[in-house]
């Protein structure tokens, strides 16, 4: 914002404060009345009366009470915006005179209540004839388009309230988000899942490979961690006999910001006993198709230059096969087998050849995943399940019966990014104990995203976890697809931001 723009804005703010002082003195009140009640929304009026003729409305003389924010002034008409949409109000010359005397006129951004008969203009637009009116809230700051428009992306996120006022696309995105969450919840309940809530603060962080946020509980005098995932608590509930559970809630990971990452994000995580990861993939196909149709009216939606198709069966590829598919000219990759994947020197060589910066503590499985992420993941635009994840990067997943190097795990990709992660759960307490210990060793070697050892979870497994499959779905990333947006900040109301200087 230039110095001149700032001066102009400060001048307008001072003028509006002066108007509010005038209102307070004239009304002998605080200038913020709270006794107006609206009885109609713009969308409902359009639905009920939009097809009626001008003459029919005049004959009806239907009186309505509306309220909202003044977004434009066009001669005697005010454009009023509220949660359902916009509608015009007509101010006669007498009303305009009264507005001037009582409020020194209305400004863009003011919130008003209006009562009067519903009419239709010559152009066919509904409007309310202002017979009674009240200024409910004086807007002291002008809306941004008065000066330069809300074009600063950072300002959109820092002042989301302003973004929502002036940007219809933003409002629509968050309405879609709400509908997506509701549709998922309804789907899960219909499938016999029970919604639960598990702790947000953990004594031992677990359930995902991620760096946690640390806090301190004063009364207990103990460090605690904001949860990185609810997984271990949800599986404790399955041990306890709740065979189908789900939770939609926040996770926290003390990691960087990117178009795909926010330290605080929403996950839907669920577990079902007597099922495996194949059942999860089938359930995911049914869920996303139903949610898309429920929210958007179609199981096909635009995403960038693509059309994402949520209908039917989705592609299923092993991680190794996906790497081979998207590296057809790379001889070493084309010749790679699972025996070769376990040759660390070979994997380091291949990783470097595809421009992966290798960390010294990475395992063979991590190297395979990084090669996949560099060469294949960005190309998975249509819904795709990637399977056969190595055991050394899947510490909570069940080993494959035919190949102990891999697990019965998948990650689900759309639009070139991971949206979900699921697997047949490891319910062998002894194997889980050994994998936790391997994670502790990895942490000691410098991997700060490796998991902690959770002795109580081992105790829970020793009581017996039935054959179980579980999955987490990133709500924010899923909503990015439904809203055709390409940064996670556009679908989180108040994303994390660096402090302003």
From Swiss-Prot:
Keywords: Aminoacyl-tRNA synthetase, ATP-binding, Cytoplasm, Ligase, Magnesium, Metal-binding, Nucleotide-binding, Protein biosynthesis. HAMAP family: Lys_tRNA_synth_class2. Mg(2+) 1 binds at residues 411, 418. It catalyses: tRNA(Lys) + L-lysine + ATP = L-lysyl-tRNA(Lys) + AMP + diphosphate. This is Lysine--tRNA ligase. SUPFAM superfamilies: Class II aaRS and biotin synthetases, Nucleic acid-binding proteins. GO terms for cellular component: cytosol. One of its GO terms (molecular function) is tRNA binding.
């Amino acid at each position: 914002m230039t110095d001149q723009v700032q001066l102009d804005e400060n001048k307008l703010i001072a003028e509006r404060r002066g108007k509010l002082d005038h209102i307070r003195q004239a009304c002998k009140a605080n200038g913020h009345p709270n006794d107006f009640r609206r009885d109609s929304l713009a969308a409902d009026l359009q639905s009920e009366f939009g097809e009626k003729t001008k003459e029919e409305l005049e004959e009806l003389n239907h009186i309505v009470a509306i309220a909202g924010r003044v977004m434009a002034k066009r001669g005697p008409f005010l454009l009023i915006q509220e949660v359902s949409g916009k509608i015009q109000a007509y101010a006669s010359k007498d009303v305009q005179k009264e507005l001037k005397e009582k409020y020194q006129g209305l400004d863009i951004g003011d919130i008003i209540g209006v009562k009067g008969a519903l009419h239709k203009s010559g152009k066919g637009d509904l409007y309310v004839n202002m017979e009674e009116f009240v200024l409910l809230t004086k807007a002291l700051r002008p809306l941004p388009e008065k000066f330069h428009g809300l074009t600063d992306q950072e300002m959109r996120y820092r002042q989301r309230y302003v973004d929502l006022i002036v940007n219809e696309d933003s409002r629509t995105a968050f309405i879609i988000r709400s509908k997506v969450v509701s549709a998922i919840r309804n789907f899960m309940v219909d499938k016999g899942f029970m919604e639960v809530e598990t702790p947000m603060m953990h004594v031992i962080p677990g359930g995902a490979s991620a760096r946690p946020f640390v806090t301190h509980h004063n009364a207990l005098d103990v460090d605690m961690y904001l949860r990185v995932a609810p997984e271990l608590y949800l599986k404790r509930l399955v041990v306890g006999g709740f065979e189908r559970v789900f939770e939609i809630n926040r996770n926290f990971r003390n990691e960087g910001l990117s178009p795909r990452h926010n330290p605080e994000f929403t996950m839907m995580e669920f577990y079902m006993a007597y099922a495996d990861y194949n059942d999860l993939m089938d359930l995911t196909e049914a869920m996303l198709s139903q949610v898309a149709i429920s929210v958007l009216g179609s199981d096909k939606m635009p995403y960038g230059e693509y059309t994402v198709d949520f209908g039917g069966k989705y592609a299923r590829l092993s991680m190794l096969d996906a790497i081979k598919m998207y590296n057809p000219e790379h001889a070493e990759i084309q010749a790679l087998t699972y025996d070769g994947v376990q040759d660390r020197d070979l994997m380091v060589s291949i990783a470097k050849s595809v421009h992966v910066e290798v960390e010294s503590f990475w395992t063979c499985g991590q190297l395979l995943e990084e090669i996949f992420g560099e060469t294949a993941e960005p190309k998975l635009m249509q819904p795709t399940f990637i399977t056969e994840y190595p055991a050394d990067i899947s510490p909570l997943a069940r080993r494959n019966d035919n190949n102990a190097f891999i697990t019965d795990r998948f990650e689900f990709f759309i639009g070139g990014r991971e949206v979900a992660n699921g697997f047949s759960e490891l319910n062998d307490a002894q194997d889980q104990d050994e994998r936790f210990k391997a994670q502790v060793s990895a942490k000691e070697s410098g991997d700060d995203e490796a998991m902690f050892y959770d002795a109580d979870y081992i105790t829970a497994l020793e009581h017996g976890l039935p054959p179980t499959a579980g999955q987490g779905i990133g709500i924010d990333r899923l909503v990015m697809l439904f809203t055709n947006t390409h940064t996670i900040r556009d679908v989180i109301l108040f994303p994390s931001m660096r402090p302003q200087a």
